[in-house]
Amino acid sequence: MAGSLYIISAPSGAGKTSLVSKLTEKDSRIQVSISSTTRPKRPGEEDGVNYVFLSVDAFKQKVAENDFLEHAQVFDNYYGTSKSVVESKLAEDKDVILEIDWQGAQQVRKLIPDAVSVFILPPSLKELEKRLRGRGTDSEDVIERRMSDAVNEMKHFNEFDYLVINNHFDTALSELHSIFLANRQACAKQYEKHSVMINELTQQH
């Protein structure tokens, strides 16, 4: 038995983190892959819970050892998804979510073509800006950069298998969960799980 790998991408402010957090509360089979990073630990963060915190040298060593499904440099910090961590979770029949951008999604799909990908969109640019401002943590320059980055990110929505519009949170959560539930009923997945029963049902007497 093995779980499925899911890629979930969205522009900053679309509500991806909140949706994924509620989804994992709702369905115990779904887990989020913990990324590795070289950025400094923030107050309240725990190593191995929020991120795996690595030195730059240790991160580059893992790149050299081909231990990342995808990795990228964001400003002055490196981020990556550990191949071994993801594989161990999938082997436990967990559905694993990678919260990565469109570039990371492209890298992962090359390695794991049957990964299921979902893109989350805000209902409008006006609403996206409102959500970014509502955080109250970013300067005007940062908000402008995030809005510009968001437009570039959203141009890649059609590279994904599914699209969820986060207009009403509960509706978007239900739609996102339905993707996971439907994928578990895929013929190949069901046969893997119930092969003995199905073979018995389809034997000629």
From Swiss-Prot:
Question: Which InterPro entries does the UniProt entry name for this protein?
Answer: GK/Ca_channel_bsu (IPR008145), Guanylate_kin-like_dom (IPR008144), Guanylate_kinase (IPR017665), Guanylate_kinase_CS (IPR020590), P-loop_NTPase (IPR027417)
Chief location of this protein within or outside the cell: cytoplasm
| GO cellular component labels | cytosol
Protein name according to UniProt: Guanylate kinase
Give the catalytic activity.
GMP + ATP = GDP + ADP
Q: Which Pfam family, any one of them, does this sequence belong to?
A: Guanylate_kin
Could you say which residues bind ATP here? A10, P11, S12, G13, A14, G15, K16, T17
**Which residue ranges does the record assign to the Guanylate kinase-like domain?**
3-181
User: Which organism is this entry from?
Assistant: Hydrogenovibrio crunogenus (strain DSM 25203 / XCL-2)
Function comment: Essential for recycling GMP and indirectly, cGMP.
Q: Where in the cell is it found?
A: Cytoplasm
TM segments?
none
Q: What EC number(s) would the UniProt record show?
A: 2.7.4.8
User: What are the protein's GO molecular function terms?
Assistant: ATP binding; guanylate kinase activity
Q: Which family does it belong to?
A: Belongs to the guanylate kinase family.
Listed A to Z, the keywords are:
ATP-binding, Cytoplasm, Kinase, Nucleotide-binding, Transferase
- CDD domains, per the entry: GMPK
- Superkingdom of the organism of origin: Bacteria
